Amino acid sequence: MSKYILAVDEGTTSARALVFDEDLNVISIAQTELTQYFPRPGYVEQNPEEIFEKQVSMIKKAVEKAKIEISQVSAIGIANQRETTIMWDSRSGRPVYNAVVWQDRRTSDITDWLKSNYLNLFKSKTGLIPDPYFSASKIKWILDNVPGVREKAERGEIKFGTVDTYLIWKLTNGKVHVTDYSNASRTMLFNIKKLEWDRDILEILEIPEAILPEVRSSSEVYGYAEPVGNIPISGDAGDQQAALFGQLGFSKGDVKCTYGTGSFILMNSGEEIYDSKDLLTTIAWKIGKDVKYALEGSIFTTGAAVQWVRDGLGLVSSSDEIESLASSVVDNGGVYFVPAFSGLGSPYWDPYARGLIIGISRGTSRGHIARAVLESIAYQVRDVIEVIKKDVGKEFVNVLKVDGGVSKNNLLMQFQADILGIRIVRPRVIETTSMGASMLAGLAVDYWSSLEELKSKWAVDREFIPSLQEDRRERLYKGWKEAVRRTIGWAREVETME
């Protein structure tokens, strides 16, 4: 009887489960949308119980669609939206508050204070720049603002987890409270040099260490999924680190970009921890005793900008239509779009930037707006690649591997090659986040024997070669940089006018 690996891909907007065979073919996909709540400007929340219930439902549905028995699944690997913060009562198992999503900006005041007083400490210990993006300030906000939670936490009655931790805890019926090194490194509480929770930071933020999960490797058996046949849960990684693994980014210098709700560029930096002023240093994964680090640029709004064109502007009826609309014009017509809906991430790190469309004339059409939106994605990726080249050397970034749903857009991928001036490689299976989770799970239970075996099963779908002349490339990019300059600090400036 054939055996399979199941990936849980718990994203920002959907709960997904995928079944892979030993040749890394996707046998089935089950997916359902998750509800997001926006109770106040800057707030983004989800219901943790909805996340769990829908994820279990998708596991069962993926197995059913694959026309296999649950007993044929050798292991489960989890990849999750990172930083999103869940806290729950350890006795009842009930969340004490909604999940505070990584996009949430309510804690800007806390992180401004941390930046002003402890920037170098946080950067040197965690590799991260204080920002509402990460879990630490979200935890502090819940402890300080939800009645009774701090008192319960002090008594050891509260547990914290990123989404992977919560899912594993629920799947194991409360038996296992763990996370992996990649997810721990995104909390802004984890010392990436000492590989432990940092007590100095916990003291600054007044966070009890007892609420934190045990940190384990990214590929080992953590426990068994009781609601779905007691399958071993043996892979765990943050979604972007999982995607780097799924792109075979095993060697120093390997770079990938995942185009999803946001876009995330990771470069495997091996065992070296780079001190970058504008990028994040994070843990890619730990397998056995081997810890790999990565440089990361985090772009908050890319695929979400395409959704805005569909839902907010009504220019297209489906996200797929944006490519044909953007292709109806030969260029952007001088229009630039900066999608700073919730601030700007790497390399600007400005929570007060706000969105902008500039360069509009009477000749501007729907096509120009659509094209400017797509081009904004590529420009933001170049912003990050420029900093990587500056930090580690130009010789490291000659090829960019791409994945995620938005990478199916051929117009965008060609423009990405053009604006970077390097080759873009899209794999046959763009579900690399799920594939990476499957690989980590499969390696732990000897479903696959080695990284070399995995390399032999990976294939390319298409390569995009740059065709834009360098002077044109640089003129376009200069226009983008000027547009970004005009968005910086906008929300703060407006506040001072009131």
Curated annotation (Swiss-Prot):
It catalyses: glycerol + ATP = sn-glycerol 3-phosphate + ADP + H(+). ATP binds at T12, T13, S14, T261, G303, Q307, G405. Sn-glycerol 3-phosphate binds at T12, R82, E83, Y133, D239. ADP binds at T12, R16, T261, G303, G405, N409. It comes from the Archaea. Its EC number is 2.7.1.30. This is Glycerol kinase 1. The lineage of its organism: Archaea, Thermoproteota, Thermoprotei, Sulfolobales, Sulfolobaceae. Belongs to the FGGY kinase family. InterPro entries: ATPase_NBD (IPR043129), Carb_kinase_FGGY (IPR000577), Carb_kinase_FGGY_CS (IPR018483), FGGY_C (IPR018485), FGGY_N (IPR018484), Glycerol_kin (IPR005999). Key enzyme in the regulation of glycerol uptake and metabolism. Catalyzes the phosphorylation of glycerol to yield sn-glycerol 3-phosphate. It is an enzyme of class 2 (transferase).
